[in-house]
Curated annotation (Swiss-Prot):
Residues 7-189 form the tr-type G domain. It comes from Prochlorococcus marinus (strain MIT 9301). The gene is lepA. Gene3D superfamilies: 3.30.70.240, Elongation factor 4, C-terminal domain, Elongation Factor G (Translational Gtpase), domain 3, P-loop containing nucleotide triphosphate hydrolases, Translation factors. It is found in: Cell inner membrane. This is Elongation factor 4. The lineage of its organism: Bacteria, Bacillati, Cyanobacteriota, Cyanophyceae, Synechococcales.
Length: 602
């Protein structure tokens, strides 16, 4: 039993944009409170995946419990709940904010407020958190703390008169932050007497103990001898252990309202213990779950195929394993004439897709081909029905459908105003509809556009970063479906449709894309003994075509002089053979060709 009174508990999280120093600040807090000994310390202590350290982003949530003796000589328990900062993981952020009473808003004093920070601050304000502004990296030569404070006041409307200047790297201002957490973050409500409810804010898969669930007790208490019920999945379990994260797991007998801990109960898959679900007691359950639970729906889809067909079973096993720890990942088997067997996978967004692909290649040693990302289209059929389709090659022919609708997102881009023109150009190229433009400060601007999601999921982010030298940041949310003049663009190689290259494009762009596709394929497909036509088509109409000329063997080389009819006979025989070859021959499209074309597709 942890015998700490509720009034001495502070639950807080850190909100920051990528690279604004959140993980370093968390390290400092762990060090200064003596939670982690100096000798055990490694950088980005809470980012446990190699991939997280390498990319410098937080993907999975972590939590740590720190003991801190404040200036009023009382001992407090501070629970830090780490949040991912990326737009793909915003649902995880909203759940972890629900487990807190306060938040440190960390802003890089040399860069200012960014889009993701804003999105998360609004989430925090919706959850009524006490927000403490912290200006990090004040030791950098380019830091301008006063200007950034003014920016925070203008953009977010937070009072920054008691903002804290700190440098997580050198340790300046860390003590002030700890004191501010104790003084300004309210303690949890004392609801120990009420029925037990606990919020799951994260879970991960441990191969030996099953799923480990991180939770915050909202009301009542949890004892390790009790049976628990998960209210969304309706499953019940016997507890094997409960404990606290200091940052390594330590078992305890009981946790009460306000505390943050972990539990293990031989849960088989993360999908059974979803983020946002409510834990209650089986024998005396709560009447209604905590609000806000929803299942994460994938927004971006792509095909994953092993480069070596023998690796297909390994890919299946590794996706199963990955799904145990990533409940947002969806997949189903798919086959393609060009690529063989693989899986169609659904992801929360582009970053999520890259991370899954990288984890498959790194942790499971697979070599993968990824088809161009696509979104879910709504196809209205002729007889008043509609279907949703995530794979462009399965969209019905033009005569069977009335129209295609695609998802739109509302996007806000924050950038210095000298990049206004280039960003507007980029949004227009991507079929964006201009909605509004606001000047946040004299030199920073917000652009608001409505853009088809399909245009965002390819390489919008990379383009935006490269055109603005990395200064712009964006965030978006789904708005719904809209009708557009969309067509299915097929690529035919030797009159056979190559499924992985099928895409849904806007009619106005179809010709340009079709043209560049066939030209690129012409360069990449090796010559065969017969002529290969490459065509781009919309329905039965060919809009662009190229052909690869045949390799020709010199059949007359062994006739020295001699009769013309002999030569004619040989040439006729060769022509006949070529004709048969063309009818029978299969064109092997090399994997590199697909990869290059997929890049071009973007």
């Amino acid at each position: 039993m942890t015998d700490i009174s509720v009034s001495k508990i502070r639950n807080f999280c850190i909100i920051a944009h990528i690279d604004h120093g959140k993980s370093t600040l968390a390290d400092r807090l762990l060090q200064d409170t003596g939670t982690v000994q100096q000798r055990d310390m490694q950088e980005q202590f809470l980012d446990s995946m190699d991939l997280e350290r390498e990319r410098g982003i937080t993907i999975k949530l972590q939590a740590a419990r720190m003991k801190y003796k404040a200036d009023d000589s009382q001992e407090y328990v501070l629970n830090l709940i780490d949040t991912p900062g990326h737009v793909d993981f915003s649902y995880e952020v909203s759940r972890s904010l629900q487990a807190c009473e306060g938040a440190l808003l960390v802003v890089d004093a040399s860069q200012g407020v960014e889009a993701q920070t804003l999105a998360n601050v609004y989430l925090a304000l919706e959850n009524n958190l006490e927000i403490i502004p912290v200006l990090n990296k004040v030791d950098l030569p380019g830091a301008d703390a006063e200007k950034i404070k003014q920016e925070i006041e203008e953009i977010i409307g937070l009072d920054t008169s008691n903002a804290i200047n700190c440098s997580a790297k050198t340790g300046v201002g860390i003590k002030d932050i700890l004191e501010a957490i104790v003084r300004r973050v309210p303690p949890p409500q004392d609801e120990i007497k009420l029925p037990t409810k606990a919020l799951i804010f994260d879970s991960y898969y441990d191969p030996y103990r099953g799923v480990i669930v991180y939770f915050r007790v909202i009301s009542g208490s949890l004892n390790k001898r009790e049976k628990i019920l998960l209210m969304a999945s309706k499953k019940n379990y016997e507890l094997d252990e409960i404990g606290i994260m200091a940052p390594d797991q330590q078992q305890v007998d009981e946790l009460h309202a306000g505390e943050v801990g972990y539990l293990a109960a031989s849960i088989k898959s993360v999908a059974d213990a979803r983020v946002g679900d409510t834990i209650t007691l089986l024998n005396s359950p709560a009447n209604d779950p905590l609000p806000g639970y929803k299942t994460a729906n994938p927004m971006v889809f792509c095909g994953l195929f092993p480069t070596d067909a023998d690796q297909f079973p390994d890919l299946r096993v590794s996706l199963e394993k990955l799904q145990l720890s990533d409940a947002a990942l969806k997949y189903e088997p798919e086959t393609s004439s060009a690529m063989g067997f693989g899986f169609r996978c659904g992801f929360l967004g582009l970053l999520h897709m890259e991370i899954v692909q990288e984890r498959l290649e790194r942790e499971y040693d697979l070599d993968l081909i990824v088809t161009a990302p696509s979104v879910i289209y709504k196809v209205n059929l002729n007889h008043q029905e509609h279907i949703f389709i995530d794979n462009p090659s399965t969209i019905p022919d033009p005569q069977l459908r009335e129209s295609i609708e695609e998802p739109y997102v509302k996007m806000e881009i924050y950038a210095p105003n000298e990049f206004n023109g280039t960003l507007m150009g980029l949004c227009q190229e991507r079929r964006g509809v201009f909605i509004d433009m606001k000047y946040i400060t004299t030199d920073r601007v917000t652009l608001i556009y409505e853009i088809p999601l399909a245009e965002v999921v390819t390489d919008f982010f990379d383009q935006m970063k490269s055109r603005t030298q990395g200064y712009a940041s964006m965030e978006y949310h789904l708005m719904g479906y809209r009708k557009n003049d969309l067509v299915r663009l097929d690529v035919l190689i030797n009159s056979e449709r190559a499924d992985p290259l099928t895409s849904i494009v806007h009619k106005d762009k179809a010709y340009g894309i079709g043209r560049s596709l066939v030209e690129k394929l012409k360069e990449l497909i090796p010559k065969q003994q017969f002529k290969i036509p490459i065509q781009a088509s919309i329905g039965s109409r060919i809009i662009a075509s190229e052909s690869i000329s045949a390799l020709r063997k010199d059949v007359l080389s062994k006739c020295y002089g001699g009769d013309i009819s002999r030569k004619k006979k040989l040439l006729k025989k060769q022509a006949k053979g070529k004709k048969r070859m063309k009818a029978m021959g299969k064109v092997e499209v090399p994997q590199e060709a697909f990869m290059a074309v997929l890049k071009l597709n973007q």
